[in-house]
């Protein structure tokens, strides 16, 4: 196997990792940092590779929600109240991370982008998820790990996207700021933040997917603009392979997650985070 073929296989693998982990609460960035280090993936285009494969993931979620997205855009432009309110909530949730990111993202990456930080945040985030899920009420007859995702969930005040309040949306936005630290997980922070704010689990998950569109698109455009000079012709094939792999795998994951959260909690992901964090810590210690 030639070096160029091996490089493409690594890019394909990392694209799959990005697509599989971007929309579940396990931290795609943390996985890319750790696994990229494990397989010794080196891109001459630097940050551009990561930006492009994340763009592949966000295009997948936009494709899946294309009908609802078009309804949102059309309704907002024509003044439909519930669509205007939904757009307002997305803007409120987007702004905190946009402001904090514009000011501090360079410092955050310099200080926190390290496997050791990922190990700690994976474990801590896992225990926080377990704590939040433990607070979620269950109905009699639920299977182990299943939760009530109906209006009988008395602790949730928002059971649909239209019922989310401006205060709840802003709370989700503040939670998203924490996800700038690798290993925290953007989807995990926004979903758990939403649940703490009183948004039902499935609705919080859907809101997280919609919030990912402006957040990830904005971050991708900003990072691509800042790093376009690093783009190498030699790396174009690897970037294209990673993009396609991320897009296709994200298509599968987003649909699967929406089905999963209708009848299950996020506990399995919490335990996965804790286990992976301990493995990463052991690997760092053994190096």
From Swiss-Prot:
GO biological process entries: cell wall organization; peptidoglycan biosynthetic process; regulation of cell shape; response to antibiotic
Organism expressing this protein natively: Bordetella pertussis (strain Tohama I / ATCC BAA-589 / NCTC 13251)
Domain of life: Bacteria
Name of the protein this chain belongs to: Undecaprenyl-diphosphatase
Enzyme Commission number(s) from the entry: 3.6.1.27
Listed HAMAP family: Undec_diphosphatase (MF_01006)
UniProt record similarity statement: Belongs to the UppP family.
Topology of the protein relative to the lipid bilayer: Multi-pass membrane protein
Reactions catalysed according to its record: di-trans,octa-cis-undecaprenyl diphosphate + H2O = di-trans,octa-cis-undecaprenyl phosphate + phosphate + H(+)
EC primary class: hydrolase
PANTHER family to which the protein is assigned, alphabetical: UNDECAPRENYL-DIPHOSPHATASE
Pfam families reported in the protein's UniProt record: BacA
Purpose: Catalyzes the dephosphorylation of undecaprenyl diphosphate (UPP). Confers resistance to bacitracin.
Localization annotation: Cell inner membrane
Disulfide bonds: none
Primary localization class, coarse: membrane
GO molecular function list: undecaprenyl-diphosphatase activity
